[in-house]
């Protein structure tokens, strides 16, 4: 696996993305790429580890830093960082990451995933950012109907039935919108808590649910990107 940084320019200011690439990426890079959006903690070692897992599966993984260098382990500070990030700013960073991934690595098809806050941005980007081919948001908030009505790419939405943030009621809103607008959305819910995929948080991590969700996401990206 190869790792490096990618510089991103946005109207809100410059930032970087952590990049993990397969060892056997030929030429300008792997043709299939995944944009990975971090949780409200920022660009943590856990995010870099996840990028490496995608690279090990043959994808170029680009994880943009939406907080421009800020990280925290404190939930109150994380909440302030998240609520201080305008949707438009985050989407602009994602759009820049998509464009730079195509330019720097020759990526032909690009997917997006994210967790918690990153899941919110991944789903919103699936509706609004050009150049994406598939999305796999984990327990992110649901956009309003105006945004969802623009969704055209397949979405695998991963949820936890015991999630007190992205509750089953919110997930049902997504299901209802998918039916109403005939959207290409599949929802998979596990008997698990919010953030069940994060193996650095033993109080919520669910290894069985995480392993199953991982295989589902890989299947989606292999079908749509590779």
List the model feature ranges, each with a label.
Residues 1-226:
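N-terminal cap/leader regions of alpha/beta-hydrolase-fold enzymes
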């Amino acid at each position: 696996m190869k790792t490096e940084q990618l510089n991103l320019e946005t109207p809100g200011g410059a930032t970087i993305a952590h990049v993990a690439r397969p060892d056997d990426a030929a030429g300008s890079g792997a043709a299939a790429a995944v944009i990975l959006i971090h949780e409200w903690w920022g660009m943590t070692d856990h995010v870099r580890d996840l990028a490496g897992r995608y690279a090990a599966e043959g994808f170029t993984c680009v994880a943009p830093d939406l907080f421009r260098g800020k990280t925290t382990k404190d939930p109150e500070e994380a909440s302030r960082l998240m609520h201080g990030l305008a949707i438009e700013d985050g989407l602009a960073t994602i759009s820049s990451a998509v464009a730079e991934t195509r330019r720097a690595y020759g990526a032909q098809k690009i997917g997006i995933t994210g967790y918690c806050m990153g899941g919110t941005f991944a789903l919103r980007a699936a509706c609004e950012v050009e150049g994406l081919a598939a999305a796999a948001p984990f327990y992110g908030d649901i956009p309003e109907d105006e945004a969802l009505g623009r969704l055209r790419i397949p979405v695998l939405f991963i949820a936890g039935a015991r999630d007190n943030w992205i509750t089953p009621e919110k997930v049902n809103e997504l299901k209802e919108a998918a039916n109403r607008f005939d959207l290409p959305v599949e929802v998979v819910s596990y008997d698990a808590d919010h953030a069940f995929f994060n193996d650095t948080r033993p109080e919520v991590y669910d290894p069985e649910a995480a392993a199953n969700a991982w295989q589902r996401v890989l299947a989606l990206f292999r079908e749509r990107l590779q």
